[in-house]
Amino acid sequence: MMDPGIAGASQLLRRAREVFQHDAAALAVVDDLQGRLEGPLRIAVAGMVKAGKSTLLNAIIGEEIAPTDAGECTRIVTWYRHGHTPRITLHPILGEPQALPVARADGRLVFNLGDVRAEDVERLVVDWPAAGLRDLTLIDTPGIDSLSQDVSGRSTEFLLPEDTPMAADAVIYLLRHLHASDLRFLESFKDTAAGKSGTVNALAVLSRADEIGAGRIDSLISAAVIAERYSRDQNLRPLALGVVPVAGLLAQSARTMRQTDFEAMQVLAQMDRKQRERLMLSANLFIRAAEPAGLGSDAKASLVQRFGLFGIRLGVALIRGGISNPTELAHELARRSGLGQLLSNISSLFQTRADALKARAAVVGLEALLRGSPREHALALEADLEKLQASAHEFRELKLLATLRTGGLSLTPELTAEAEQLVGGRGSTAPLRLGLDAEATPEHITEAARLCLNRWRLMAENPLTEPAALDACRVVLRSCEGILAAYSALPAGR
Protein backbone atom coordinates (compact mmCIF):
# COMPACT_ATOMS: atom_id res chain seq x y z
CA MET A 1 0.00 0.00 0.00
CA MET A 2 2.82 2.43 0.88
CA ASP A 3 6.00 3.42 -0.96
CA PRO A 4 8.35 0.42 -1.05
CA GLY A 5 11.14 1.68 1.21
CA ILE A 6 12.66 -1.81 1.29
CA ALA A 7 13.23 -1.65 -2.49
CA GLY A 8 15.01 1.68 -2.08
CA ALA A 9 17.14 0.27 0.74
CA SER A 10 18.08 -2.74 -1.37
CA GLN A 11 19.06 -0.49 -4.27
CA LEU A 12 21.14 1.64 -1.91
CA LEU A 13 22.98 -1.45 -0.66
CA ARG A 14 23.75 -2.50 -4.23
CA ARG A 15 25.26 0.94 -4.77
CA ALA A 16 27.24 0.56 -1.52
CA ARG A 17 28.61 -2.76 -2.75
CA GLU A 18 30.03 -0.97 -5.79
CA VAL A 19 31.56 1.79 -3.67
CA PHE A 20 33.17 -0.66 -1.20
CA GLN A 21 34.15 -3.32 -3.75
CA HIS A 22 37.80 -3.27 -2.58
CA ASP A 23 37.02 -3.19 1.18
CA ALA A 24 36.36 -6.73 2.42
CA ALA A 25 35.30 -5.65 5.92
CA ALA A 26 32.82 -3.10 4.60
CA LEU A 27 31.45 -5.61 2.08
CA ALA A 28 30.79 -8.05 4.94
CA VAL A 29 28.72 -5.36 6.68
CA VAL A 30 26.79 -4.64 3.48
CA ASP A 31 26.14 -8.36 2.95
CA ASP A 32 24.82 -8.64 6.50
CA LEU A 33 22.50 -5.67 5.96
CA GLN A 34 21.24 -7.21 2.71
CA GLY A 35 20.59 -10.45 4.60
CA ARG A 36 18.45 -8.53 7.07
CA LEU A 37 16.34 -7.15 4.24
CA GLU A 38 15.79 -10.58 2.73
CA GLY A 39 15.26 -12.50 5.97
CA PRO A 40 12.36 -12.56 8.43
CA LEU A 41 11.76 -9.83 11.00
CA ARG A 42 14.08 -10.09 14.01
CA ILE A 43 12.50 -9.53 17.42
CA ALA A 44 14.56 -9.55 20.62
CA VAL A 45 12.97 -10.57 23.93
CA ALA A 46 14.50 -8.53 26.76
CA GLY A 47 13.90 -7.76 30.41
CA MET A 48 15.29 -7.96 33.90
CA VAL A 49 16.45 -11.22 35.46
CA LYS A 50 13.55 -13.62 36.21
CA ALA A 51 11.10 -11.60 34.12
CA GLY A 52 10.04 -14.75 32.26
CA LYS A 53 11.70 -14.09 28.89
CA SER A 54 12.42 -17.69 27.88
CA THR A 55 9.02 -18.87 29.06
CA LEU A 56 7.29 -16.23 26.95
CA LEU A 57 9.48 -17.08 23.98
CA ASN A 58 8.41 -20.73 24.26
CA ALA A 59 4.79 -19.64 24.35
CA ILE A 60 5.19 -17.57 21.18
CA ILE A 61 6.94 -20.43 19.37
CA GLY A 62 4.54 -23.07 20.69
CA GLU A 63 7.26 -25.48 21.82
CA GLU A 64 9.53 -25.77 24.86
CA ILE A 65 12.86 -25.17 23.14
CA ALA A 66 14.22 -22.21 25.14
CA PRO A 67 15.79 -23.20 28.50
CA THR A 68 13.90 -21.66 31.42
CA ASP A 69 16.12 -22.78 34.29
CA ALA A 70 19.03 -20.77 35.66
CA GLY A 71 21.61 -22.75 33.69
CA GLU A 72 24.57 -21.38 31.79
CA CYS A 73 22.64 -21.18 28.50
CA THR A 74 20.41 -18.45 29.92
CA ARG A 75 23.59 -16.33 30.05
CA ILE A 76 24.02 -16.48 26.26
CA VAL A 77 22.27 -14.54 23.51
CA THR A 78 20.32 -17.23 21.64
CA TRP A 79 18.71 -16.89 18.21
CA TYR A 80 15.68 -19.01 17.30
CA ARG A 81 14.93 -19.17 13.61
CA HIS A 82 12.97 -21.39 11.25
CA GLY A 83 14.72 -24.41 9.78
CA HIS A 84 13.55 -27.57 8.04
CA THR A 85 15.49 -29.79 10.46
CA PRO A 86 16.43 -29.16 14.11
CA ARG A 87 19.96 -27.83 14.49
CA ILE A 88 21.94 -26.00 17.19
CA THR A 89 25.06 -24.04 16.26
CA LEU A 90 27.48 -22.50 18.75
CA HIS A 91 29.28 -19.37 17.56
CA PRO A 92 32.33 -18.75 19.79
CA ILE A 93 33.87 -15.33 20.28
CA LEU A 94 37.07 -16.77 18.80
CA GLY A 95 37.14 -19.67 16.37
CA GLU A 96 34.80 -21.40 13.98
CA PRO A 97 31.11 -22.24 14.62
CA GLN A 98 30.43 -25.75 15.85
CA ALA A 99 27.34 -27.95 15.89
CA LEU A 100 25.88 -29.02 19.23
CA PRO A 101 23.89 -32.21 19.80
CA VAL A 102 20.11 -31.85 19.57
CA ALA A 103 18.63 -33.59 22.60
CA ARG A 104 15.38 -33.35 24.54
CA ALA A 105 14.53 -34.31 28.12
CA ASP A 106 10.94 -34.45 29.37
CA GLY A 107 9.83 -32.70 26.19
CA ARG A 108 12.31 -29.82 26.61
CA LEU A 109 15.30 -29.01 24.43
CA VAL A 110 18.61 -29.48 26.26
CA PHE A 111 21.72 -27.45 25.44
CA ASN A 112 25.09 -29.11 26.07
CA LEU A 113 28.02 -26.74 25.57
CA GLY A 114 30.56 -29.47 26.23
CA ASP A 115 33.90 -27.98 27.28
CA VAL A 116 33.03 -24.47 26.06
CA ARG A 117 32.42 -21.85 28.76
CA ALA A 118 29.35 -19.63 28.42
CA GLU A 119 31.50 -16.50 28.57
CA ASP A 120 33.40 -17.69 25.47
CA VAL A 121 30.22 -17.95 23.38
CA GLU A 122 29.11 -15.03 21.22
CA ARG A 123 25.71 -16.58 20.46
CA LEU A 124 23.78 -19.79 19.97
CA VAL A 125 21.62 -20.26 16.86
CA VAL A 126 18.74 -22.73 17.02
CA ASP A 127 17.12 -23.73 13.73
CA TRP A 128 13.76 -25.34 14.42
CA PRO A 129 10.81 -26.46 12.22
CA ALA A 130 8.19 -24.49 14.17
CA ALA A 131 5.34 -22.67 12.42
CA GLY A 132 5.74 -19.78 14.87
CA LEU A 133 9.20 -19.07 13.44
CA ARG A 134 8.30 -18.95 9.74
CA ASP A 135 7.93 -15.17 9.67
CA LEU A 136 9.93 -14.26 12.79
CA THR A 137 13.40 -14.77 14.17
CA LEU A 138 13.24 -14.51 17.97
CA ILE A 139 16.30 -13.59 20.02
CA ASP A 140 16.46 -14.54 23.71
CA THR A 141 18.74 -12.25 25.72
CA PRO A 142 20.28 -12.64 29.20
CA GLY A 143 18.71 -10.71 32.05
CA ILE A 144 19.46 -7.01 32.39
CA ASP A 145 20.64 -5.76 35.80
CA SER A 146 21.98 -9.22 36.65
CA LEU A 147 24.24 -9.50 39.68
CA SER A 148 26.76 -10.89 37.22
CA GLN A 149 28.36 -8.02 35.33
CA ASP A 150 29.30 -10.43 32.53
CA VAL A 151 25.68 -11.55 32.02
CA SER A 152 24.29 -8.04 32.17
CA GLY A 153 27.06 -6.79 29.90
CA ARG A 154 26.16 -9.33 27.22
CA SER A 155 22.61 -8.04 27.00
CA THR A 156 23.71 -4.42 27.09
CA GLU A 157 26.27 -4.97 24.34
CA PHE A 158 23.73 -6.76 22.15
CA LEU A 159 20.70 -4.55 22.81
CA LEU A 160 22.43 -1.19 23.20
CA PRO A 161 25.37 -1.09 20.77
CA GLU A 162 27.14 2.26 20.64
CA ASP A 163 28.26 2.57 17.02
CA THR A 164 26.26 -0.02 15.10
CA PRO A 165 22.56 -0.76 14.62
CA MET A 166 21.03 -3.28 16.96
CA ALA A 167 20.84 -6.79 15.49
CA ALA A 168 17.07 -6.90 16.12
CA ASP A 169 14.42 -4.91 14.27
CA ALA A 170 12.09 -4.67 17.27
CA VAL A 171 12.03 -5.51 20.98
CA ILE A 172 9.52 -7.16 23.26
CA TYR A 173 10.43 -5.85 26.71
CA LEU A 174 9.18 -7.73 29.78
CA LEU A 175 8.56 -5.90 33.03
CA ARG A 176 6.98 -7.07 36.26
CA HIS A 177 6.57 -3.59 37.71
CA LEU A 178 7.38 -0.23 36.19
CA HIS A 179 10.75 0.50 37.77
CA ALA A 180 13.21 3.27 36.98
CA SER A 181 15.61 0.62 35.66
CA ASP A 182 13.03 -0.44 33.05
CA LEU A 183 12.59 3.14 31.90
CA ARG A 184 16.36 3.65 31.79
CA PHE A 185 16.81 0.66 29.53
CA LEU A 186 13.99 1.65 27.16
CA GLU A 187 15.31 5.21 27.05
CA SER A 188 18.80 3.92 26.27
CA PHE A 189 17.37 1.62 23.62
CA LYS A 190 15.66 4.57 21.97
CA ASP A 191 18.98 6.45 22.02
CA THR A 192 20.95 3.71 20.25
CA ALA A 193 21.86 4.04 16.61
CA ALA A 194 18.57 2.37 15.68
CA GLY A 195 16.60 4.55 18.02
CA LYS A 196 18.15 7.77 16.66
CA SER A 197 16.23 7.10 13.47
CA GLY A 198 13.25 8.50 15.32
CA THR A 199 11.23 5.31 15.62
CA VAL A 200 9.40 3.51 18.39
CA ASN A 201 9.79 -0.24 17.91
CA ALA A 202 9.43 -1.63 21.43
CA LEU A 203 6.38 -3.39 22.88
CA ALA A 204 6.15 -3.82 26.66
CA VAL A 205 4.75 -6.94 28.30
CA LEU A 206 3.52 -7.00 31.89
CA SER A 207 4.92 -10.46 32.54
CA ARG A 208 3.96 -13.13 35.06
CA ALA A 209 0.59 -11.41 35.14
CA ASP A 210 -1.03 -14.28 37.06
CA GLU A 211 1.16 -13.44 40.08
CA ILE A 212 -0.18 -9.89 40.38
CA GLY A 213 -3.31 -11.06 42.16
CA ALA A 214 -1.47 -13.69 44.24
CA GLY A 215 -2.73 -16.44 41.94
CA ARG A 216 -6.42 -15.60 42.37
CA ILE A 217 -8.77 -16.58 39.56
CA ASP A 218 -9.25 -12.87 38.73
CA SER A 219 -5.51 -12.10 38.62
CA LEU A 220 -5.47 -11.35 34.90
CA ILE A 221 -8.28 -8.83 35.30
CA SER A 222 -6.17 -6.94 37.83
CA ALA A 223 -3.16 -7.25 35.53
CA ALA A 224 -5.11 -5.78 32.60
CA VAL A 225 -6.03 -2.73 34.69
CA ILE A 226 -2.38 -2.20 35.67
CA ALA A 227 -1.19 -2.67 32.07
CA GLU A 228 -3.68 -0.07 30.86
CA ARG A 229 -2.43 2.37 33.49
CA TYR A 230 1.18 1.73 32.49
CA SER A 231 0.34 2.26 28.80
CA ARG A 232 -0.84 5.79 29.65
CA ASP A 233 2.20 6.57 31.81
CA GLN A 234 3.85 9.70 30.44
CA ASN A 235 7.33 8.26 31.02
CA LEU A 236 6.66 4.92 29.33
CA ARG A 237 4.39 6.05 26.50
CA PRO A 238 7.18 7.64 24.38
CA LEU A 239 9.26 4.47 24.70
CA ALA A 240 6.84 1.62 23.93
CA LEU A 241 3.93 1.06 21.57
CA GLY A 242 1.78 -0.46 24.29
CA VAL A 243 1.69 -2.72 27.36
CA VAL A 244 0.20 -6.23 27.15
CA PRO A 245 -0.43 -8.36 30.27
CA VAL A 246 0.62 -12.00 29.77
CA ALA A 247 0.76 -15.00 32.09
CA GLY A 248 3.77 -16.55 30.39
CA LEU A 249 3.86 -19.87 32.26
CA LEU A 250 0.17 -20.47 31.56
CA ALA A 251 0.64 -19.50 27.90
CA GLN A 252 3.63 -21.83 27.48
CA SER A 253 1.92 -24.80 29.11
CA ALA A 254 -1.33 -24.22 27.24
CA ARG A 255 0.56 -24.28 23.92
CA THR A 256 2.28 -27.54 24.96
CA MET A 257 -0.55 -29.21 26.90
CA ARG A 258 -0.33 -32.95 27.42
CA GLN A 259 -3.13 -35.48 27.83
CA THR A 260 -1.87 -36.20 31.36
CA ASP A 261 -2.25 -32.50 32.28
CA PHE A 262 -5.89 -32.55 31.23
CA GLU A 263 -6.62 -35.82 33.04
CA ALA A 264 -5.06 -34.52 36.26
CA MET A 265 -7.22 -31.38 36.13
CA GLN A 266 -10.27 -33.55 35.52
CA VAL A 267 -9.54 -35.43 38.75
CA LEU A 268 -9.27 -32.12 40.64
CA ALA A 269 -12.50 -30.86 39.07
CA GLN A 270 -14.37 -33.84 40.54
CA MET A 271 -13.36 -32.94 44.12
CA ASP A 272 -15.58 -31.11 46.57
CA ARG A 273 -15.05 -27.37 46.01
CA LYS A 274 -14.21 -26.47 49.63
CA GLN A 275 -11.84 -29.41 49.94
CA ARG A 276 -10.11 -28.42 46.71
CA GLU A 277 -9.76 -24.78 47.79
CA ARG A 278 -8.18 -25.82 51.11
CA LEU A 279 -5.82 -28.09 49.21
CA MET A 280 -4.65 -25.25 46.96
CA LEU A 281 -3.82 -22.67 49.61
CA SER A 282 -0.14 -23.21 48.77
CA ALA A 283 1.93 -25.21 46.32
CA ASN A 284 3.61 -27.23 49.09
CA LEU A 285 0.29 -28.16 50.68
CA PHE A 286 -1.12 -29.16 47.31
CA ILE A 287 1.83 -31.40 46.41
CA ARG A 288 2.17 -33.09 49.82
CA ALA A 289 -1.52 -33.77 50.46
CA ALA A 290 -2.72 -37.37 50.14
CA GLU A 291 -5.87 -36.39 48.28
CA PRO A 292 -7.32 -36.59 45.75
CA ALA A 293 -7.16 -40.31 45.15
CA GLY A 294 -5.59 -41.20 41.85
CA LEU A 295 -3.33 -38.13 41.71
CA GLY A 296 0.12 -38.69 43.18
CA SER A 297 2.60 -36.09 44.41
CA ASP A 298 4.73 -36.36 41.25
CA ALA A 299 1.74 -35.61 39.03
CA LYS A 300 0.75 -32.66 41.22
CA ALA A 301 4.31 -31.32 41.29
CA SER A 302 4.37 -31.48 37.48
CA LEU A 303 1.09 -29.55 37.32
CA VAL A 304 2.45 -26.82 39.61
CA GLN A 305 5.70 -26.59 37.66
CA ARG A 306 3.90 -26.34 34.33
CA PHE A 307 0.82 -24.25 35.18
CA GLY A 308 1.26 -22.69 38.62
CA LEU A 309 -1.63 -22.58 41.09
CA PHE A 310 -3.38 -19.91 39.02
CA GLY A 311 -3.30 -22.06 35.89
CA ILE A 312 -4.55 -25.10 37.78
CA ARG A 313 -7.42 -23.14 39.32
CA LEU A 314 -8.38 -21.69 35.95
CA GLY A 315 -8.15 -25.05 34.18
CA VAL A 316 -10.31 -26.75 36.79
CA ALA A 317 -12.88 -23.94 36.62
CA LEU A 318 -13.07 -24.27 32.83
CA ILE A 319 -13.52 -28.05 33.03
CA ARG A 320 -16.28 -27.61 35.60
CA GLY A 321 -17.78 -25.04 33.23
CA GLY A 322 -18.18 -27.61 30.47
CA ILE A 323 -14.87 -28.03 28.62
CA SER A 324 -14.45 -31.74 27.96
CA ASN A 325 -11.30 -32.22 25.86
CA PRO A 326 -7.65 -31.13 26.11
CA THR A 327 -7.59 -29.26 22.78
CA GLU A 328 -10.46 -26.99 23.78
CA LEU A 329 -8.94 -26.43 27.22
CA ALA A 330 -5.54 -25.58 25.72
CA HIS A 331 -7.08 -23.01 23.37
CA GLU A 332 -9.08 -21.36 26.14
CA LEU A 333 -6.15 -21.24 28.57
CA ALA A 334 -3.91 -19.72 25.88
CA ARG A 335 -6.55 -17.11 25.10
CA ARG A 336 -7.01 -16.16 28.74
CA SER A 337 -3.26 -16.03 29.35
CA GLY A 338 -3.01 -12.90 27.21
CA LEU A 339 -0.92 -14.66 24.56
CA GLY A 340 -3.52 -14.06 21.86
CA GLN A 341 -3.46 -10.31 22.45
CA LEU A 342 0.35 -10.31 22.40
CA LEU A 343 0.50 -12.27 19.12
CA SER A 344 -2.08 -9.91 17.64
CA ASN A 345 0.02 -6.90 18.66
CA ILE A 346 3.20 -8.46 17.28
CA SER A 347 1.39 -9.01 13.99
CA SER A 348 -0.27 -5.59 13.74
CA LEU A 349 2.57 -3.45 15.12
CA PHE A 350 5.62 -5.29 13.80
CA GLN A 351 4.93 -7.95 11.19
CA THR A 352 2.60 -5.88 9.01
CA ARG A 353 5.31 -3.22 8.73
CA ALA A 354 8.24 -5.62 8.73
CA ASP A 355 9.57 -4.24 5.45
CA ALA A 356 9.71 -0.71 6.85
CA LEU A 357 11.44 -1.83 10.06
CA LYS A 358 13.99 -3.93 8.16
CA ALA A 359 14.64 -1.16 5.65
CA ARG A 360 15.06 1.33 8.49
CA ALA A 361 17.61 -0.97 10.16
CA ALA A 362 19.52 -1.35 6.89
CA VAL A 363 19.65 2.42 6.38
CA VAL A 364 20.85 2.99 9.95
CA GLY A 365 23.47 0.28 9.47
CA LEU A 366 24.73 1.93 6.31
CA GLU A 367 24.88 5.30 8.08
CA ALA A 368 27.05 3.72 10.79
CA LEU A 369 29.33 2.20 8.14
CA LEU A 370 29.75 5.56 6.39
CA ARG A 371 30.68 7.32 9.64
CA GLY A 372 33.77 5.15 9.90
CA SER A 373 34.65 5.12 6.20
CA PRO A 374 36.88 7.36 4.05
CA ARG A 375 35.22 10.62 3.12
CA GLU A 376 35.13 9.85 -0.60
CA HIS A 377 33.06 6.72 0.08
CA ALA A 378 30.63 8.63 2.25
CA LEU A 379 30.20 11.37 -0.35
CA ALA A 380 29.40 8.78 -3.01
CA LEU A 381 26.43 7.49 -1.01
CA GLU A 382 25.22 10.39 1.15
CA ALA A 383 23.00 11.94 -1.53
CA ASP A 384 21.23 8.64 -2.28
CA LEU A 385 20.87 7.98 1.43
CA GLU A 386 19.28 11.35 2.12
CA LYS A 387 16.98 10.98 -0.88
CA LEU A 388 15.71 7.62 0.37
CA GLN A 389 15.14 8.93 3.88
CA ALA A 390 13.20 11.92 2.58
CA SER A 391 11.07 10.02 0.08
CA ALA A 392 10.23 6.71 1.80
CA HIS A 393 6.84 7.29 3.37
CA GLU A 394 7.19 4.35 5.77
CA PHE A 395 10.16 6.08 7.41
CA ARG A 396 8.20 9.31 7.76
CA GLU A 397 5.36 7.39 9.40
CA LEU A 398 7.71 5.74 11.89
CA LYS A 399 9.28 9.08 12.77
CA LEU A 400 5.92 10.82 13.17
CA LEU A 401 4.68 8.00 15.37
CA ALA A 402 7.61 8.58 17.73
CA THR A 403 6.94 12.34 17.76
CA LEU A 404 3.24 11.84 18.48
CA ARG A 405 3.97 9.55 21.42
CA THR A 406 6.27 12.13 23.00
CA GLY A 407 3.61 14.84 22.81
CA GLY A 408 5.85 17.03 20.69
CA LEU A 409 3.10 18.53 18.51
CA SER A 410 0.49 21.21 19.16
CA LEU A 411 -2.44 18.89 18.43
CA THR A 412 -5.41 18.14 20.66
CA PRO A 413 -5.37 14.74 22.39
CA GLU A 414 -8.15 13.58 20.05
CA LEU A 415 -6.24 14.58 16.91
CA THR A 416 -3.02 13.10 18.27
CA ALA A 417 -4.78 9.77 18.85
CA GLU A 418 -6.31 9.85 15.36
CA ALA A 419 -3.00 10.71 13.71
CA GLU A 420 -1.26 7.93 15.61
CA GLN A 421 -3.87 5.46 14.41
CA LEU A 422 -3.80 6.65 10.78
CA VAL A 423 -0.01 6.30 10.47
CA GLY A 424 -0.17 2.74 11.78
CA GLY A 425 0.50 3.12 15.50
CA ARG A 426 -2.17 0.51 16.30
CA GLY A 427 -1.56 -1.67 13.28
CA SER A 428 -0.77 -0.95 9.66
CA THR A 429 -3.65 -2.65 7.86
CA ALA A 430 -6.25 -0.27 6.43
CA PRO A 431 -9.08 -1.31 8.82
CA LEU A 432 -6.83 -0.84 11.86
CA ARG A 433 -5.64 2.54 10.63
CA LEU A 434 -9.24 3.68 10.15
CA GLY A 435 -10.65 2.12 13.33
CA LEU A 436 -12.87 -0.30 11.38
CA ASP A 437 -13.64 -3.99 11.85
CA ALA A 438 -11.26 -6.39 10.14
CA GLU A 439 -14.14 -7.51 7.89
CA ALA A 440 -14.91 -3.97 6.66
CA THR A 441 -15.81 -3.84 2.97
CA PRO A 442 -13.71 -1.88 0.47
CA GLU A 443 -16.59 0.59 0.17
CA HIS A 444 -16.57 1.28 3.92
CA ILE A 445 -12.79 1.57 3.92
CA THR A 446 -12.66 4.07 1.05
CA GLU A 447 -15.50 6.10 2.57
CA ALA A 448 -13.75 6.29 5.96
CA ALA A 449 -10.40 7.10 4.34
CA ARG A 450 -11.96 9.89 2.29
CA LEU A 451 -13.53 11.42 5.40
CA CYS A 452 -10.17 11.35 7.19
CA LEU A 453 -8.41 12.77 4.16
CA ASN A 454 -10.81 15.72 3.97
CA ARG A 455 -10.57 16.41 7.71
CA TRP A 456 -6.77 16.47 7.71
CA ARG A 457 -6.63 18.44 4.47
CA LEU A 458 -8.71 21.19 6.09
CA MET A 459 -6.27 21.27 8.99
CA ALA A 460 -3.29 21.43 6.63
CA GLU A 461 -4.88 24.36 4.80
CA ASN A 462 -5.61 26.26 8.02
CA PRO A 463 -3.17 29.21 8.22
CA LEU A 464 -3.13 28.92 12.02
CA THR A 465 -1.67 25.41 11.94
CA GLU A 466 1.89 25.49 13.30
CA PRO A 467 4.73 24.33 11.01
CA ALA A 468 5.49 21.15 12.99
CA ALA A 469 1.82 20.20 13.04
CA LEU A 470 1.62 21.01 9.32
CA ASP A 471 4.38 18.49 8.60
CA ALA A 472 2.43 15.91 10.60
CA CYS A 473 -0.70 16.70 8.59
CA ARG A 474 1.17 16.04 5.36
CA VAL A 475 2.33 12.62 6.55
CA VAL A 476 -1.20 11.71 7.66
CA LEU A 477 -2.60 12.93 4.33
CA ARG A 478 -0.12 10.75 2.45
CA SER A 479 -1.18 7.74 4.54
CA CYS A 480 -4.85 8.38 3.76
CA GLU A 481 -4.02 8.80 0.08
CA GLY A 482 -2.17 5.49 0.14
CA ILE A 483 -5.24 3.71 1.51
CA LEU A 484 -7.49 5.29 -1.11
CA ALA A 485 -5.08 4.45 -3.92
CA ALA A 486 -4.82 0.82 -2.82
CA TYR A 487 -8.57 0.28 -2.52
CA SER A 488 -9.51 2.31 -5.59
CA ALA A 489 -7.39 -0.10 -7.61
CA LEU A 490 -9.42 -3.12 -6.45
CA PRO A 491 -11.97 -4.58 -8.90
CA ALA A 492 -15.55 -3.56 -8.17
CA GLY A 493 -17.38 -5.81 -5.72
CA ARG A 494 -14.27 -7.04 -3.91
Predicted features and spans:
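Globular "head" domains of long coiled-coil molecular machines
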Residues: Q34, E38-L281, R336
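Short amphipathic alpha-helical coiled-coil/interface segments
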Residues: V30, L366, L385, C473-C480
